[in-house]
Amino acid sequence: MASQVVLSFALVVVLAVFVGQVDSCPSDCKCDYRSSQCRPANDDVHPNVCIDHYCVVMNLAKREQRPELSPGAWDDSSEEKDNEASLA
């Protein structure tokens, strides 16, 4: 019996990792992934419905690694961001 509980829990964990996110928000709320807090899904939902609810997000996407700069090399990433901001 105990082994079935452990296996069930392990299956839930594996499925959560496979899906990439565990969302524990009420049905009228959605997960704000930056703050891991639940927010109203639309304007018809009262904010108190979602308060005190949190969601856990596991981001499995790999970020592209930036190459290491040699000492004294110019890092122009902030300049690129400034150019993109001025174009927007």
UniProtKB/Swiss-Prot annotation:
Keywords, alphabetical: Cleavage on pair of basic residues, Disulfide bond, Secreted, Signal, Toxin
Record PTM text: Contains 3 disulfide bonds.
Tissues in which the UniProt entry reports expression: Expressed by the venom gland.
A GO MF label: toxin activity
Signal peptide: 1-24
Subcellular localization: Secreted
Propeptide cleavage-removed residue intervals: 79-88
Superkingdom of the source species: Eukaryota
GO cellular component: extracellular region
Residue ranges, annotated region (Disordered): 66-88
Similarity-based family: Belongs to the scoloptoxin-XY family.
Listed name of the protein: U-scoloptoxin(XY)-Er1a
Originating species: Ethmostigmus rubripes (Giant centipede)
